Amino acid sequence: MSDVNAHLLAQRIDTVLDILVAGDYHSAIHNLEILKAELLALAADDAEQKNQPKAPWEI
C-alpha cells in the first residue's frame, strides 16, 4: 500500500493556490493535472498490489 504524505500533499495544494492568487490560471491547472496524475498512479499501484494472488503462506 502506498503512503501518501499528507503534509507534502498540503504543500503542493498550497502552491497551486498561490499560483491561482497570482493569476496564472494555466500554470495552476497544469500543476493540478500533474498532481492528479500522480495520485491516480498511486491508486493504480495500490489496486494492482491488492489484486495479486496471495502465496499459500499468506492466506
Curated annotation (Swiss-Prot):
Full protein name: UPF0509 protein KPK_3153
Family membership noted in the UniProt record: Belongs to the UPF0509 family.
Domain of life from the UniProt record: Bacteria
Alphabetical list of InterPro entries matching this protein: UPF0509 (IPR020887)
Annotated NCBIfam families: PRK13658.1
One Pfam family, short name: YciZ
Lineage: Bacteria, Pseudomonadati, Pseudomonadota, Gammaproteobacteria, Enterobacterales
